Amino acid sequence: MLKNQVKIGNWTYKINPSIKKYALRDAGFTQTTHGEFRYTHPLYLDSPYDTIGFVKIDVNESLTQLDILTVGNDKMTKINLFKNKKLQPVVDLLKFNLDDLVEREIISEVK
């Protein structure tokens, strides 16, 4: 795995070379006070009001570095969704969100 790639579960992603800042904003990313772009989406089993955590995606200001984390409800503690078979629907939701970002040409899946 190269330096600018992120592995989450069995998937590896990188920044799409044709990424634009306006595309990040259109996809729901917000710019932090430090200039990086952050996307946070709840992860849940049955109800979006009963979350088990969040996927947190950060892109640096120069659009060259990607970070993807699954975190608990406090948005700070890292959680591993891939160890528990009961969380497979949550893993499917995570994959759906990541596939949406691939479709929007924000990230690319490394094969």
Task: Give short role names for the model-derived ranges.
Residues L2-V6, K21, F37-Y39, M76, ...:
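Generic, low-specificity signal for short hydrophobic/alpha-helical stretches with a mild N-terminal bias
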